[in-house]
Swiss-Prot record:
Its job: Involved in the post-transcriptional modification of the uridine at the wobble position (U34) of tRNA(Lys), tRNA(Glu) and tRNA(Gln). Catalyzes the conversion of 2-thiouridine (S2U-RNA) to 2-selenouridine (Se2U-RNA). Acts in a two-step process involving geranylation of 2-thiouridine (S2U) to S-geranyl-2-thiouridine (geS2U) and subsequent selenation of the latter derivative to 2-selenouridine (Se2U) in the tRNA chain.
Reaction catalyzed: 5-methylaminomethyl-2-thiouridine(34) in tRNA + selenophosphate + (2E)-geranyl diphosphate + H2O + H(+) = 5-methylaminomethyl-2-selenouridine(34) in tRNA + (2E)-thiogeraniol + phosphate + diphosphate; 5-methylaminomethyl-2-thiouridine(34) in tRNA + (2E)-geranyl diphosphate = 5-methylaminomethyl-S-(2E)-geranyl-thiouridine(34) in tRNA + diphosphate; 5-methylaminomethyl-S-(2E)-geranyl-thiouridine(34) in tRNA + selenophosphate + H(+) = 5-methylaminomethyl-2-(Se-phospho)selenouridine(34) in tRNA + (2E)-thiogeraniol; 5-methylaminomethyl-2-(Se-phospho)selenouridine(34) in tRNA + H2O = 5-methylaminomethyl-2-selenouridine(34) in tRNA + phosphate
Name of the molecule in the record: tRNA 2-selenouridine synthase
Domain of life: Bacteria
Residue ranges of domain Rhodanese in the record: 14-137
Biological process according to GO: tRNA wobble uridine modification
Gene name tied to this protein: selU
Ranges in a coiled coil: none
GO molecular function: transferase activity, transferring alkyl or aryl (other than methyl) groups; tRNA 2-selenouridine synthase activity
Organismal lineage: Bacteria, Pseudomonadati, Pseudomonadota, Gammaproteobacteria, Enterobacterales
Organism from which the protein derives: Escherichia coli (strain SE11)
Entry keywords, A to Z: Selenium, Transferase
C-alpha cells in the first residue's frame, strides 16, 4: 500500500490540485480543508465524539473497538461504496485524515481488501496545513505590486489578467466592501489560507515569478483575514493607482452590483425569490454602513434605493440606482479611499487610467 510523505510531495499535491478523499469527521472538515478535498468521513460527528470520549475514559483499545462497532454492517458498506466510487472517479487521488493515523490507514486497508490500492498522506491534513502555511511565508517574500483605486476602478479585473496576479477577493469569495458578499459562502479561515497557498504555489510554478500583483486590500476581506506574513509584506509594497473617469466607474459598478448580482440571484433562486434576495442584498449592504452615513443620510439613500428597485422591477432599467450610488461614492467611499491612500502616499509609484496601469504592470 502506498504513502506520500515528503515536503516536496505535499507541495506537488497542492500545485496539481490532487483530489483528496478526506475521511475526517464533517466538523473537522468544516474547520479547515485542502482546496481539492471531498469529505467522505469514516465516522460522523456523533460517532467521532463517542470514540473520543471512550478513548479518554477507557484507552485506545476500547476506543478502536467502539469505532469498529459503530462503523459496521450496512453503515460500513455504504461508506465503502462511497469511497470506492470516489477512488474510481479520482484514480490519481489520495486519502487523508487528521494526522495520517488510524482513520486513513483503516480506510486504506478496507479498500485494499476490496482490490483498490490507494495512497494516503502520511502526516495527514496537519502536514498539508503546515506545508501551506510555510509556502505562504516563503512566497510572500517575493516583491509585491499593489493595484489601488477608488471603488469601480476595475482593480480586480486588472489583477485577474496578470499572469503573476492572485485574486484575493475571488479566493475569499467576497469583494471586500459592505456590498461585497457573493452567492458563494465564505470558507473557514484555515480553508481560505490553504486555498491562497495553493494558488500562490500554482502561480509560482507556472513561470519564473519575479513579483506578485495583488489588489490593495485591507486586512479583512469579509470574514476572512489575510495571513499576517502576506499582510505585512503588502504594507511595504509599491502601489499603482487606477484613476478612471467617474462615468467609467459607474458603468462597472452598474454591471457588477446591479445587472450581474440580479442575474446571479435569479439564476440561483428563480425569478420571485431571486428578486427578493437581490433587494435584501442591496439593503443589507447599505444598512451595514448606516452608522457611518448617519441616520438621516441613510434614510434618504434607503428611500432612493427603494425607488430604484421599483423602477428596475417594472421597467428593467438600473439607471435609477444612480440616485443613491453617486452620492454614496462621492460622500462616503471615495473620501474614505483617498484618506487611506494619503496615509501611504510615499508607496505610490504610478498613476493612470486602467489600460495605462495594466501596461505599466506588464512591463515590471
Amino acid at each position: 500500500m502506498q504513502e506520500r510523505h515528503t515536503e516536496q510531495d505535499y507541495r506537488a499535491l497542492l500545485i496539481a490540485d490532487t483530489p483528496i478523499i478526506d475521511v475526517r469527521a464533517p466538523i473537522e472538515f468544516e474547520q479547515g480543508a485542502m482546496p481539492a478535498a471531498i469529505n467522505l468521513p469514516l465516522m460522523n460527528n456523533d460517532e467521532r465524539a463517542a470514540v473520543g470520549t471512550c478513548y479518554k475514559q477507557q484507552g485506545s483499545d476500547a476506543a478502536l473497538a467502539l469505532g469498529h462497532k459503530l462503523v459496521a454492517g450496512e453503515i460500513r458498506q455504504q461508506r465503502m461504496d462511497a469511497w470506492r466510487a470516489a477512488c474510481l472517479q479520482n484514480p490519481q487521488g489520495i486519502l487523508c485524515c487528521a494526522r495520517g493515523g488510524q482513520r486513513s490507514h483503516i480506510v486504506q486497508s478496507w479498500l485494499y481488501a476490496a482490490g483498490i490500492d490507494y495512497p494516503l498522506v502520511e502526516g495527514g491534513y496537519k502536514a498539508l496545513r503546515q506545508t501551506a502555511i510555510q509556502a505562504t511565508i516563503e512566497l510572500a517574500q517575493k516583491p509585491i505590486v499593489l493595484i489601488g483605486g477608488c471603488t469601480g476602478s476595475g482593480k480586480t479585473l486588472l489583477v485577474q489578467q496578470q499572469p503573476n496576479g492572485v485574486d484575493l477577493e475571488g479566493l475569499a469569495r467576497h469583494r471586500g466592501s459592505a456590498f461585497g458578499r457573493t452567492l458563494q459562502p465564505q470558507l473557514s479561515q484555515a480553508s481560505f489560507e490553504n486555498l491562497l497557498a495553493a494558488e500562490m504555489l500554482k502561480t509560482d510554478a507556472r513561470q519564473n515569478l519575479r513579483l506578485w500583483v495583488l489588489e490593495d486590500e485591507s486586512r479583512m476581506i469579509g470574514s476572512n483575514h489575510l495571513p499576517e506574513c502576506l499582510r505585512e509584506r503588502m504594507t511595504q509594497a509599491a502601489i499603482a493607482v487606477v484613476e478612471d473617469p467617474f462615468e467609467i466607474r459607474l458603468e462597472r459598478l452598474n454591471e457588477e452590483y446591479f445587472l450581474r448580482m440580479h442575474h446571479d440571484f435569479t439564476h440561483a433562486y428563480g425569478d420571485e425569490q431571486g428578486w427578493q434576495e437581490y433587494c435584501e442584498y442591496l439593503h443589507h449592504g447599505l444598512s451595514a454602513i448606516k452608522r457611518r452615513l448617519g441616520l438621516q443620510r441613510y434614510n434618504e439613500l434607503a428611500a432612493q434605493l427603494d425607488t430604484a428597485l421599483t423602477t428596475q422591477l417594472t421597467t428593467g432599467s438600473t439607471d435609477g440606482h444612480l440616485a443613491w450610488l453617486v452620492p454614496l461614492l462621492k460622500e462616503y467611499y471615495d473620501p474614505m479611499y483617498r484618506y487611506q491612500l494619503e496615509k501611504k502616499a510615499e508607496k505610490v509609484v504610478f498613476r493612470g487610467e486602467w489600460a495605462e496601469v495594466a501596461e505599466w504592470v506588464k512591463a515590471r
